[in-house]
Amino acid sequence: MHYKKAFLASLLSSIALTAYAPPEPWATLTPSSKMDGGTTEYRTSFGLAVIPFTVTESKVKRNVISQINDGQVQVTTQKLPHPVSQIGDGQIQVTTQKVPPVVSHIVSQIGDGQLQITTAKNVVTKSTIAVPSKTATATATSTATAVSQIHDGQVQVTISSASSSSVLSKSKLEPTKKPNNENVIKVQACKSSGTLAITLQGGVLIDSNGRIGSIVANRQFQFDGPPPQAGAIYAGGWSITKHGTLAIGDNDVFYQCLSGTFYNLYDQSIGGQCNPVHLQTVGLVDC
């Protein structure tokens, strides 16, 4: 009888341990501090636009982030708003393209998840941007170049020349109409192929390929996994501030650092080719 009771106790303990699902180990990779009033849940897909510190609110330059395939996030070297793009590996990039003020470029993503912004030159047209929290609007020559994502997830904005087909088909970049906490995203931008599209779930950023937004060992912002890249510093603790900017912990200042024909994004300056920026969250619409 004694052995039978011991066996049953062991069996029940084993079942209890099996039922327990601990959180992902990388979910604990978060900053020690949080953004006051930050939103950690936003399940509707949104993009990011790079806003340099040199512009005023009345002439907002939004570089929409792109993402290359490996998940890296990149921004072009273009002197205007760029939607962040993402290349295939998850990197985020922004291009170095030069154009008149008041333009919106979405961050793109390349295939590996990197985010990039390119330096491409775009054809521009007259358009009006409604400035958030202001009654007046600023009219100027402007376009919206979406930041793309390559296959590794890098986010980029390229420096290749763009045609007039990339120009905004709508004349206004307007505040989005969202209920409750979704009002935190106040503007919209055109979505195109490669544009970084993400959601925020419990302080974790997830791109359209299911990869996790993280600050990796070299301080670069990109998307990998899951799990995130080995040696990642942060994989959680993301939020949207009450001003609509992306934050990691209590910090909403990022750096676009020149890398050839595009910028990569970092949470710290890594040298002389870096400039401080805000990453403005934008609602993505088909134009």
Curated annotation (Swiss-Prot):
Keywords: Cell wall, Cleavage on pair of basic residues, Repeat, Secreted, Signal. GO terms for molecular function: structural constituent of cell wall. The keyword Disulfide bond does not apply. Its main location: secreted. Covalently linked to beta-1,3-glucan of the inner cell wall layer via an alkali-sensitive ester linkage between the gamma-carboxyl group of glutamic acids, arising from specific glutamines within the PIR1/2/3 repeats, and hydroxyl groups of glucoses of beta-1,3-glucan chains. The record marks R62, N63 as: Cleavage. InterPro entries: PIR1-like_C, Yeast_CWMannoprotein_PIR, Yeast_PIR_rpt. It is found in: Secreted, Cell wall. This is Cell wall protein PIR5. GO terms for cellular component: extracellular region; fungal-type cell wall.
